């Protein structure tokens, strides 16, 4: 079988399809938009020539019966939006070449059976919104190069199996809202250098096991805070140590950033005052003088 350049939706929603012929000549194909979307009975996939592919939007989305994936050539791919989204049967993922990829929105979202992830070259990626959202089986995450990434909205949301997180370079990030929402297994968090981010709303919401948050996280924060910048950022983080809360407030104070001119100005967080230090009072006073509203244990300071 020989195809032209466009294989868009060619096998879309063929629920009865259980295999794909390895003899398909796909060497000229550039567009794989939703090619095998909703092929829910597809149990395996052959090593096709996908070297010319640039668009892999939704290509294998909802192929829920796939348990593994071949090491295909995707070095020309730029857009991987939703490519393997909802491939809930995948237990592993190969070290494919995605070095040209810029858009990884929802790429592996809800791949719930993945327990680990390879060290892919994601250095060209700019958008990672919800890329690994609801990958609840992940127990570790690699030190990927995401230094060009700007959007991390909901990126690791619902990755409840992660207990730690790598010190990624997120220096270009502008949005990290809900990035680690309900990562209920996280016990500690690293420095990431997210100094260009304008919004952290819901970023660590519901991280119920999070105890340790680093000092100096916001010290070099230079972005202008967006509306509702810290809205519910640490709500539900009931295990945070007093030191971690002090680290957060002291660091925001050190940054010199003032509250946004619009939207919610609250920084709401639970604080174990019995093991705290006087430093928090100074931080609270400084932040209030810059327009922030500080709410500790449900009480406005």
Locations of regions flagged by a protein language model:
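Negatively charged
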Residues: 1-301
